[in-house]
Amino acid sequence: MNKTRPGPARCVMVLGTTSGAGKSWLATALCRYYSNQGLKVAPFKAQNMSNNARVVAAPGEQFGEIGSAQYFQALAARAVPDVRMNPLLLKPEADTKSQVVLLGQVSDELSQLPWRGRSQRVWPQIAAALDALRAENDVVVIEGAGSPAEINLHASDVVNMRVARHAEARCLLVTDIDRGGAFAHLFGTWALLPEEERALIAGFVLNKFRGDEALLAPAPQMLQDKTGVPVVATIPMQWNHGLPEEDGVFDMRSTAVGAVHTRIAVVAYPRISNLDEFQPLKNVPGVRLSWARSPADVEGADWIVLPGSKATAADLAWLRAQGLDAAIAAHAARGGRVLGVCGGLQMLGEALIDTVGVDGNGPGLGLLPLVTSFEATKTVRPTRQCFGAVQGAWRHLAGVAVQGYEIHHGQTAQHPAMAASGDVARELMPGLAWQNPAGNVLGLYLHGLFEDAAVLRALFGADAPTLDAVFEGLAAGIARHFEPRALDALAAQ
C-alpha cells in the first residue's frame, strides 16, 4: 500500500498503567483498524524486553530480530516487518543480564553497558528508526512499555514519554480494570506526568471489564472532571483474544475446544523463549495445552514439549533439579511423544559443548544420539524446509513443507562415538531436524511449526483460526467499544 497523506505520519501511542494492561493487543487492533481505513500503517516499539523474537528483514539484505509483538502488529497493519519497528530488543539471559539487540543485530558492546548509560547511547538510533517509519507511512501505532509514570526511570526513558514527545503522539492510557483500582491507576499515572506530557494523553481505556457498564458511573465523568481526559473505551474481558502473549507464560484457560483427545505439556523453564509459537495449539479442537514445572505436571500427557531456551545449560540444570529429566525419560520409554524445539532439541542430545562461553557445558538428556557445540556467531534467518521420511508417532509430518525461522548459537550433529556403534538419529531436515530410531522423539531447530496450517492439519486433522481472522476480530471489537469517532480523531492530521 502506498502512503496516502503528505508529511510525516500521525502517531497514535498506546500506554499502560502497568505491565499486562493490554497495550500489545490494543496496538495490534489499532494497526488493523487503521489499515482497514485505507491508510498505510506501521507499528513501533522503541524498546522491548522479551525472549519472544521473530526473524525479519534488516538492511543490506540481512535478517535480524524484533519482538514478536511488533512482528504480529506489522502483519495486522499489512506491512512487511522490519527491524526499525523494534529498534532495541533486550533478551533476558539471567535476572540481571540481557543480550542487547540493536536494529536486529546482537551488540556485545551494549550488552556490557549498564542500563542508564545504554539508554543515552541508543536514543539517536531509536529516533531515526521512528522518523523513517513516519516518513513512509500515514499512521504509526506506537506501543509503550510498563508504565510511563515510573518516576525513577523518567530521566533515562527511551520507550514511553520521550517517544511520545518526539512523535507528538496522541496517547491512549489503558488500564486493567479486572485487577481493581483502575481509576486510581489512571489518575495516579496522569498526575505523576509533567504537565507537557499530560497534554499528550488523549483518552483513557478501561480494559478487561466484566459486568454491567452502567455500574461504572459516575467514575468516568469524575475522572474527566479532574484530568480533562475522557474515558474513550470500555473493553470487555477477552479470555482468548487469539494473539500470543508478549511476555511470560500465557494464560492456559479455555485451551481445549470440544472433547480432549491430545494433552500437550510444555516445560516452562525459567529462560523459556519463543513460547508464542505454541499459541495456535490453544485453538485446535480437542487439544489441551498446559505448562509443566514438576513431574506431576506431565502425568497423563500425550506429548511433552521442550521449547526454546535463552540459557540452555542453565534451564537443563533447572529441569533436572525438578526431577523432570526422569519423568521425560520414563514418558519416552513408554512410547510417549517428546518434541524438542531449538534449545529443547539441544537438551535432548547427549552433550552440550561450549568452548566460547555462550551457554555452558553439560550432559544432555540422552534421548537423541546428538551433540551440540555452541558458537559465538548467532544464526538468524527465515527457513523453509520439507520433512523427510518421518516414521513412527510423527509419521504424519512426512513430506510436509514448513515455513519457519531459526534463532540459535548452537550447531548440532550426530554424536561421533555413538554413530560409530550404529546408534544414529534419523535426519529429517539437513542440519535442522532429527528423530530417534523408535520414532517417538523428535527434535528440530525450526521455530514456527504450529503456526503452519499444513502441520496442524497433518498432526490434528484440523485448522486453527487464521491470524487474519484474529486481526479482523480485534479491529471489529475496538470499533464497537470505542466512543464514536474517537479512533478516527486519534489518527486525523
UniProtKB/Swiss-Prot annotation:
PROSITE patterns: GATASE_COBBQ. It holds the Pfam family CbiA. One of its GO terms (molecular function) is ABC-type vitamin B12 transporter activity. InterPro entries: Class_I_gatase-like, CobQ/CobB/MinD/ParA_Nub-bd_dom, CobQ_GATase1, CobQ_N, CobQ_synth, GATase_3, P-loop_NTPase. GO terms for biological process: cobalamin biosynthetic process. Pathway: Cofactor biosynthesis; adenosylcobalamin biosynthesis. The active site is at C342 (nucleophile), H447. The keyword Protein biosynthesis does not apply. It comes from the Bacteria. Keywords: Cobalamin biosynthesis, Glutamine amidotransferase. Residues 261-455 form the GATase cobBQ-type domain. Gene3D superfamilies: 3.40.50.880, P-loop containing nucleotide triphosphate hydrolases (3.40.50.300). Belongs to the CobB/CobQ family. CobQ subfamily. Catalyzes amidations at positions B, D, E, and G on adenosylcobyrinic A,C-diamide. NH(2) groups are provided by glutamine, and one molecule of ATP is hydrogenolyzed for each amidation. PANTHER family: COBYRIC ACID SYNTHASE (PTHR21343:SF1), DETHIOBIOTIN SYNTHETASE (PTHR21343). This is Cobyric acid synthase. It comes from Acidovorax sp. (strain JS42). The gene is cobQ.
